[in-house]
Amino acid sequence: MENIISLLALKNDPTSATTGAGLVAVGAGLASIGNFGTGLGQGLSAGRAAEAVGRNPEAIKKIRSLMIIGMAISESASLYSFIIAILLVFVY
């Protein structure tokens, strides 16, 4: 915890501008990791939906609607992490 506090103190120090910029870049990179999980989850969801349609073609409308709802919910996490990364880069 002391390391985090000392890093925050370095960020606010005007003489260490490069340290602050580096911390912002690291934070934006960590926020972008959220996009990895979303892409993986959406790919698995689409694959399972294609499998389900292959096994039961009559249920394509229900499967498609459930898949779209699930992808929209998982996409919201990706959008939040993207917005945080953009805010870190352009605001700080």
Swiss-Prot record:
Protein name per its UniProtKB record: ATP synthase subunit c
The keyword Transport is annotated on this UniProt entry: yes
Signal sequence region: none
PROSITE patterns listed in its UniProt record: ATPASE_C (PS00605)
Gene3D superfamilies, A to Z: lithium bound rotor ring of v- atpase
Taxonomic lineage of the native organism: Bacteria, Bacillati, Mycoplasmatota, Mycoplasmoidales, Metamycoplasmataceae
Localization per Swiss-Prot or TrEMBL: Cell membrane
Membrane topology reported for the UniProt record: Multi-pass membrane protein
Family per similarity comment: Belongs to the ATPase C chain family.
HAMAP family tied to this protein: ATP_synth_c_bact (MF_01396)
Keywords: ATP synthesis, Cell membrane, CF(0), Hydrogen ion transport, Ion transport, Lipid-binding, Membrane, Transmembrane, Transmembrane helix, Transport
A single GO molecular function term of this UniProt record: proton-transporting ATP synthase activity, rotational mechanism
A GO cellular component entry from the record: plasma membrane
Chief localization: membrane
Coiled-coil residues: none
Source taxon at top rank: Bacteria
Positions of the record's site feature: Reversibly protonated during proton transport: E75
Task of the protein: F(1)F(0) ATP synthase produces ATP from ADP in the presence of a proton or sodium gradient. F-type ATPases consist of two structural domains, F(1) containing the extramembraneous catalytic core and F(0) containing the membrane proton channel, linked together by a central stalk and a peripheral stalk. During catalysis, ATP synthesis in the catalytic domain of F(1) is coupled via a rotary mechanism of the central stalk subunits to proton translocation. Key component of the F(0) channel; it plays a direct role in translocation across the membrane. A homomeric c-ring of between 10-14 subunits forms the central stalk rotor element with the F(1) delta and epsilon subunits.
Subunit-structure text: F-type ATPases have 2 components, F(1) - the catalytic core - and F(0) - the membrane proton channel. F(1) has five subunits: alpha(3), beta(3), gamma(1), delta(1), epsilon(1). F(0) has three main subunits: a(1), b(2) and c(10-14). The alpha and beta chains form an alternating ring which encloses part of the gamma chain. F(1) is attached to F(0) by a central stalk formed by the gamma and epsilon chains, while a peripheral stalk is formed by the delta and b chains.
Transmembrane segments: 20-40, 71-91
InterPro entries found in the cross-reference section: ATP_synth_csu_bac/chlpt (IPR005953), ATP_synth_F0_csu (IPR000454), ATP_synth_F0_csu_DDCD_BS (IPR020537), ATPase_proteolipid_c-like_dom (IPR002379), F/V-ATP_Csub_sf (IPR035921)
Organism: Mycoplasmopsis pulmonis (strain UAB CTIP) (Mycoplasma pulmonis)
A Pfam family the protein falls into: ATP-synt_C
